[in-house]
Amino acid sequence: MYKLNKQDAIAYDQRGGYINQAGKYVVTIESAVFHVGNNANGRSENLKLSVIDNQKRKATFFINTSYSNGVQNEGGLRTVSAILACLREHDSGEPTPAQVKEYNRETQQEEAVMRDCFTKFHGKQLGIVVQMAHEDGRENPSPNLYSVFEASSELTAGEIMRAETRPAQLGKIMAYIANKPLIDKRKNSPVPPQPTRQPMPQPATPAAPVEDIDSDIPF
């Protein structure tokens, strides 16, 4: 009645765990938490994005959008805009309380907690490109969110905004990741740290005035 399927048997051993290799993944967003940090320098704002792929491998990315001194993190804001484009959403909506799962280091298991979340993101599929990074304070490299793309089409945010229909940029990104799957950000690294992003080509046409931006969104 049942027969051995070699691929299924191999996949069984690969299920679960965490994303721990550089590459591209199609993931489902489990939670998008509005994470606020408070310290002596002030308040910082972050998007804590928890994702899972079809093999049940998980990853969590912190995207800082505002430093504790109140200065906006332009790189983080660009990343959030790219995610919105790849999800075909105009905005994240306001954070609202929602139940999410978080790992408790003391009990060493996941627990249900209430957090302020951007629930528009929850359950949506997203393409991500991961580059592994070795950072101070961590024994092993951890996944770094290098780029995002639309899960269904493999179009990048820029291609979506230009209303293009054929993905071209993702292949270039993956060629770069194949060449640099791991970067070492440690201060006492034995090798000089590598840049985490490729220089991006400048747009051929000037950016639209602020008041026209929303009307130019092609979705």
Segments from the language model and where they lie:
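Short beta-rich binding modules
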Residues: 1-219
